[in-house]
């Protein structure tokens, strides 16, 4: 990124249309393209920015940067090693997308038609908003959620870039579901697999009973719910969901037998999704740790066993 997302580096394997806010490389001067992609991620791009009202990268300054690169064969081995980690992360992400779609399909087949359901109710019958508090000192960048580090399109979350300056924030527990309450059309949702905390811009839905956890998440994950939330939101520039209106969302009240049958399928799926995300975090840490060490030669790529 030249402006806006300054310093973010992307690798395009297919044809693309670059905007004038980007810098792109076409000629690699005999170097391995994938290696250069990883190498560029190690540069301190902030030192190349111009001191203007809208900071941007000065390409002339970048061109003058003196760098040292290994031979082409070493480049290929380094790129291959790092690519293996990225491919595994990509595969896990695709698996999780399929598992989430499968879970939603099963939910819709069993409980999607609330009009025909024998037992009908509203969202407040199966959950409430968390009123618990947790000390910020007990949280970290992995266990704190805000609208900034929750991803749109139901894609989960990333690590937080900072923690709140307040002493306490909303406490969330295993089995709760988090939804960003700002611009709900972005569909930011996270299933809590452990104790955590969230900002005031995030709604923490706590199931009325623990065995409602998977059912609650599946209910809130549905596009139909987000459409309902958007319809009741207030504000134009930065709309927020109406907490009272949200709790009137119509739901099916499953029998104990129906709920048990659903949990038999849903709980293992959610556990697998969590396991894959946890593995992705470990792989990302490993990749980001190896990246500068491989580039600098501190670690010989031949010594890396994956």
Each predicted region: which residue ranges?
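A short beta-sheet element
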Residues: 1-41, 50-53, 58-59, 169-170, ...
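Sequence-specific dsDNA recognition surfaces
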Residues: 10-13, 17-24, 124-135, 139-174, ...
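Proline-centric
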Residues: 22-30, 46, 60-86, 203-213, ...
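Structured core elements
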Residues: 24, 66, 177-179, 204, ...
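A short secondary-structure junction motif
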Residues: 43, 47, 152-154, 223, ...
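Non-catalytic DNA-recognition/assembly elements of restriction-modification systems
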Residues: 64-136, 150, 256-302
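Amphipathic heptad-repeat alpha-helical coiled-coil/stalk segments that mediate oligomerization
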Residues: 305-306
């Amino acid at each position: 990124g030249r402006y806006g997302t300054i310093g973010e580096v992307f690798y395009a394997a297919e044809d693309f249309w670059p905007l004038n806010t980007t810098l792109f490389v076409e000629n690699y001067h005999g170097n391995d393209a994938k290696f250069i992609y990883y190498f560029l991620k190690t540069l301190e791009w902030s030192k190349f920015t111009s001191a203007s009202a809208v900071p941007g990268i000065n390409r002339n300054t970048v061109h003058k940067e003196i760098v040292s690169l290994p031979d082409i064969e070493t480049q290929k081995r380094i790129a291959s090693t790092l690519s293996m980690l990225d491919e595994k992360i990509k595969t896990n992400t695709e698996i999780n997308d399929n598992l989430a779609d499968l879970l939603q399909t099963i939910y819709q087949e069993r409980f999607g038609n609330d009009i025909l359901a024998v037992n009908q109710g509203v969202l407040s019958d199966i959950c409430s908003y968390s009123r618990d508090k947790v000390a910020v000192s007990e949280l970290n960048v992995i266990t704190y959620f805000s609208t900034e580090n929750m991803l749109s399109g139901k894609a989960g979350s990333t690590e937080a870039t900072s923690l709140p300056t307040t002493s306490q924030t909303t406490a969330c527990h295993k089995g709760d579901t988090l939804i960003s309450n700002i611009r709900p059309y972005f569909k930011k949702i996270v299933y809590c697999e452990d104790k955590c905390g969230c900002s005031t811009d995030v709604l923490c839905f706590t199931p009325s009973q623990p065995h409602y956890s998977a059912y609650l998440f599946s209910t809130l994950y549905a596009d139909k719910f987000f459409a309902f939330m958007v319809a009741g939101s207030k504000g134009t520039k930065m709309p927020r969901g109406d907490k009272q209106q949200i709790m009137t969302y119509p739901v099916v009240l499953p029998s104990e037998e129906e709920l048990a049958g659903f949990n038999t399928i849903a709980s293992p799926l959610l556990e697998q999704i969590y396991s894959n995300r946890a593995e992705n975090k470990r792989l990302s840490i490993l990749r980001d740790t190896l990246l500068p060490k491989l580039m600098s030669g501190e670690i010989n790529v031949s010594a890396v066993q994956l």
